[in-house]
């Protein structure tokens, strides 16, 4: 959603004129909360986009801040409401586990909050910290201890991450969601 909507429209029109696109094809775009406007959503629909994937990551503003995200939960809610009001009937919400300072209870609170919104899809995945990324640089030990790795005391341990994963499966299944990917 950072690209200008007219550029997205032009690209998708070129795709449609160059290839056979099934009438019921799912055409999705990733959106960051706070970067979407009603105008963008209308152009997206005109371009044939019928599915939004919104990168919420957490309903907890402290976790969002720890991730370096530029949005708040309230900004996400405004984006979600704009999408529903624009007529989008196929919305995915991304949630992340394994975040700094995150506990099972905090994650489940985010998950239940998202379930109450009734999105068509929920993508729940675990944070993977890649060496060389800004996130890795932000959370590694001081120069003397760099080789030891990350500040593991602020990240959930493997057992907690596994408990979150299993609880996520159970909660989503009970809420009527079907797992079709593991990441």
Predicted regions and their residues:
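C-terminal scaffold of the Radical SAM
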Residues: 1-183
